Each structure stands twice: as structure tokens, then as C-alpha cells.
């Protein structure tokens, strides 16, 4: 066991009947690290959080938090971690202050003991302190839930898709708050389906269908993209998608914002490709090289894993 790690996961597997929710997961989160689990809904992120927060047991493998085994030392683990589930787990009929007092009582503490830790966050919701939690906006619920998760001064924080369902401004503010908590020495494991949030993490793990597809810094993940990448746009986007996927030299093509991203073999002849599309009746065609991002890498590795593409 490496005590420089806040979390260690060795071969965790969890099944629900015939469904393998987690398949031999292995990763470590270092102390003081902001680590992101990046993947779509159904990837296994929530199951992993429930295992690490000792709510369920694995079928195979081991995990430790703060050097304590999740299977045998779960009571001690629960005293040292904060957990913010995806639905925030607030009591909607209690006010902001009543929710905080309730969670403080659960851990045998009070607001004064954690004032310095939660006050920068609490100040943003203090004007609504007498409002019932069920009447708060998504962003305010998010901040209240984070305060509740921090009320007992945990050393490790688990955040399961904390920015889902909140506006873009609240999302950005939340990541700023996480950076401040990291600076105070708290180790953070956060999951998100938003690929753009990956860049706010020290390291990330790409996860899909219960398997880890890669672990590295965001920059390291992107540098592993190993094929030419183009953006494609035209007057018939659906038709272009089908035509591009059938073209020799195109490894894969997928919608990406207002364009399609086109992954090709090396030596791909872009001029000939445009000429072919024009001859097939497409017009206003734009094709230009772009740099890969986290989402491109995720799609590439997901297709490699499933065998749907011969990229790389």
C-alpha cells in the first residue's frame, strides 16, 4: 500500500446480474490531487463512487481510502470522506441553514468548527439561508450540497457529476471552488460527462462500459491521439456524414458541434476527397485540419476497445 495515495483501486469488479458495471478497474489518486473520471452516463462512474464510499461491496478486487480497506475499515473511512451524490441528497423541506445543521449533527460537529473551510462557499448562498432547499436554483443547491459534504472537514472528497443540470456560469464557479479546496490539501475525485471539464483536473481517467480506457494528465491524454484529424462542414450534414464514412482512407467520422470530425489515414488526400464529394452533389464543403481534444481521444479509444474502428 502506497501511503502517498489518497485512493488506491486494484482490480475492482462489480456485476449486476449479467451486467458488468465495473471490469477490473485499477487506478490511484494521489494526496492533494484533483482527479477526474470522464465518461458518459452508464460508464460505471457512480458504481465506482458507491464502492469507494463503502455503500456497496465489490465482487472482486480491493480498494483503500486514506490507507484503509473499504471492505474492513468502512466505519473509519466514512469519518474522513465527504460524498456529494449526483442528486445532491439535500432535504428539500429544510432551509439552507437547517440542512447544514443537520449534516453537522450527523458527524458530531458544528458550523463553527468548519467555518474557515466552507465560508467562501457559504457566503454565496447566505442570502438564501432561510429558503427551503427545494426552492433553490440548481447552482445554489450545488453549493449547499458541497458545504454539507465539507461540514466535517474531510480529507478526501467524492463528487459524482456535481455540475450536471446547472448553468455554465455555475459550472465554472464550481470548478474554481474545487481548485481552492485542492489548494487547502483536500484530495478530490470528481466525475463528469463533460469532456471540457477534464482540463480542470490534474489527471483524468477515461471510463466507458466499466473499463478504464486511459489515465494521464489532460495534456498527456490528448498527445496520445495518433491520426490526422479534420473538421468537415457542408450544406447537407447528414448526407456528408454517411458519404465520409464510406470513403476510402477515412477511419471514422462523427458529429462534433457544428461540424463533423474526420479521422483519416496518414497521407489522406483532402483535395481529392472534396472533389469526390462535389461530384456526388454536395456543395459549400469546408474541410480543414484541427487539433484533437479530450472528446476525440475518448471516441478513438472507445472505438478501439469495441473494435469498431482501425484507428491507430
PLM regions: where:
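Short, surface-exposed acidic/glycine-rich loop or hinge patches that mediate macromolecular interfaces
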Residues: 68-71, 212, 235, 267-268, ...
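ABC transporter nucleotide-binding domains
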Residues: 7, 14-207, 214
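ABC transporter nucleotide-binding domain
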Residues: 176-265
Amino acid at each position: 500500500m502506497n501511503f502517498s495515495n489518497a485512493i488506491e483501486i486494484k482490480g475492482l469488479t462489480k456485476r449486476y446480474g449479467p451486467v458488468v458495471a465495473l471490469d477490473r478497474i485499477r487506478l490511484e489518486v494521489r494526496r492533494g490531487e484533483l482527479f477526474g473520471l470522464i465518461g458518459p452516463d452508464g460508464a460505471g462512474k457512480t458504481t465506482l463512487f458507491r464502492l469507494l464510499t463503502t455503500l456497496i461491496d465489490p465482487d472482486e478486487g480491493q480498494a483503500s481510502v486514506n490507507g484503509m480497506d473499504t471492505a474492513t475499515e468502512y466505519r473509519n473511512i466514512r469519518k474522513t470522506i465527504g460524498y456529494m451524490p449526483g442528486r445532491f441528497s439535500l432535504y428539500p423541506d429544510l432551509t439552507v441553514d437547517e440542512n447544514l445543521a443537520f449534516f453537522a449533527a450527523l458527524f458530531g460537529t458544528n458550523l463553527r468548527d468548519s467555518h474557515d473551510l466552507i465560508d467562501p462557499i457559504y457566503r454565496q448562498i447566505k442570502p438564501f439561508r432561510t429558503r427551503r432547499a427545494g426552492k433553490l436554483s440548481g447552482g445554489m443547491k450545488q453549493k449547499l450540497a458541497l458545504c454539507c459534504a465539507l461540514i466535517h472537514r474531510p480529507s478526501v472528497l467524492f463528487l459524482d457529476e456535481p455540475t450536471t443540470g446547472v448553468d455554465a456560469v455555475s459550472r465554472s464557479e464550481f470548478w474554481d471552488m474545487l481548485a481552492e479546496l485542492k489548494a487547502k490539501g483536500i484530495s478530490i475525485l470528481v466525475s463528469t460527462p463533460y469532456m471540457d471539464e477534464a482540463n480542470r483536473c490534474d489527471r483524468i481517467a477515461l471510463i466507458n462500459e466499466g473499463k478504464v480506457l486511459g489515465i494521464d494528465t489532460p495534456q498527456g491524454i490528448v498527445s496520445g491521439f495518433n491520426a490526422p484529424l479534420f473538421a468537415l462542414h457542408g450544406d447537407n450534414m447528414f448526407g456528408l456524414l454517411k458519404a465520409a464514412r464510406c470513403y476510402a482512407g477515412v477511419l471514422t467520422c462523427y458529429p462534433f458541434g457544428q461540424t463533423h470530425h474526420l479521422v483519416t489515414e496518414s497521407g489522406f488526400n483532402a483535395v481529392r476527397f472534396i472533389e469526390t464529394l462535389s461530384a456526388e452533389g454536395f456543395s459549400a464543403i469546408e474541410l480543414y485540419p484541427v487539433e484533437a481534444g479530450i472528446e476525440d481521444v475518448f471516441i478513438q479509444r472507445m472505438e478501439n476497445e469495441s473494435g469498431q474502428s482501425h484507428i491507430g
